[in-house]
Amino acid sequence: MSQRTVFFISDGTGITAETFGNAILAQFETNFRHVRLPFTDSVDKAHQAVREINHAGIVDGNKSIVFTTLVDMEVLKVITDNCHGMVLDMFSTFVHPLESELNLKSSHRIGRFTDASKSSAYQSRIEAINFSLAHDDGQSNTDLEHSDIILVGVSRSGKTPTSLYLAMQYGLKASNYPLIPDDFERQQLPPALKAHKSKLFGLTIQPERLSEIRNERRPNSKYASLENCRMEVSEAEAMMRRSGIRWLSTTTKSIEEISTTILQEIRPERLAY
């Protein structure tokens, strides 16, 4: 199949257009060339975008696909009237019908993150990220009671990226704590976690995959050996079962899938949007 270029155009950061567009494109098993055009917030910039879109179509021999989140109708009109691509505008598709249904006018605010630094949701995210970094890999037991979620599991099972995703995406204070051989010998959770069992969620992983990941970090070590990985995973899963901790395998799941499952199970009281 010949190349097809996809443009993500916004008068803000373009994050919404790109997220929406990529979710749609993921349904099609083909490769696209991605071009981001954020801050397209004037007629002049819109005409420049049109030139890029039309040029890409000529080079590719195919219409470009254009995902937009443009609030300024004059800017959007330049795109829709002059470009030779297939234009998919989120606001025309969703916001305008909602205005009719709700009998309300939308704010038509440019950019999802306009004045974001002043919003409570933004501040919650910053606080959550700082908290999660301070409580990564059991670094600190201080204020552990303020965690919304505490992830537990063996080293390299996906705890850190999941904690940071929960903090950045939802403003949740997500701590994470490793389960190590000393815990397995005692056959008990780390003492610092016992008072917070309702907030615990376990992550596990197939030993073979864990060994691959660890060998990238510390090749040919006991830590990365398949035998050791099998032992740690088995002991960690047994401990989680004994302690009544909910858990899932991260082996074939994305960070987004892991986080969504955790939220369904834990159901924290607050989320920052």
Swiss-Prot record:
The lineage's top-level taxon is Bacteria
**Which pairs are disulfide-linked?**
none
Q: Which UniProt keywords apply?
A: Kinase, Nucleotide-binding, Serine/threonine-protein kinase, Transferase
Catalytic activity field: [pyruvate, water dikinase] + ADP = [pyruvate, water dikinase]-phosphate + AMP + H(+); [pyruvate, water dikinase]-phosphate + phosphate + H(+) = [pyruvate, water dikinase] + diphosphate
Residues given in the record as ADP binding sites:
G153, V154, S155, R156, S157, G158, K159, T160
Supply the enzyme class, top level.
transferase
Under InterPro entries, the record lists:
Kinase-pyrophosphorylase (IPR005177), PSRP (IPR026530)
Under which EC number(s) is this enzyme classified?
A: 2.7.11.33, 2.7.4.28
Checking Pfam families in the record gives:
Kinase-PPPase (PF03618)
Q: Name one GO molecular function term.
A: phosphotransferase activity, phosphate group as acceptor
Question: What role does it play?
Answer: Bifunctional serine/threonine kinase and phosphorylase involved in the regulation of the phosphoenolpyruvate synthase (PEPS) by catalyzing its phosphorylation/dephosphorylation.
User: What does the similarity note say?
Assistant: Belongs to the pyruvate, phosphate/water dikinase regulatory protein family. PSRP subfamily.
This chain belongs to the protein called: Putative phosphoenolpyruvate synthase regulatory protein
Q: Which organism is it from?
A: Albidiferax ferrireducens (strain ATCC BAA-621 / DSM 15236 / T118) (Rhodoferax ferrireducens)
The organism's taxonomic lineage, starting at the top: Bacteria, Pseudomonadati, Pseudomonadota, Betaproteobacteria, Burkholderiales
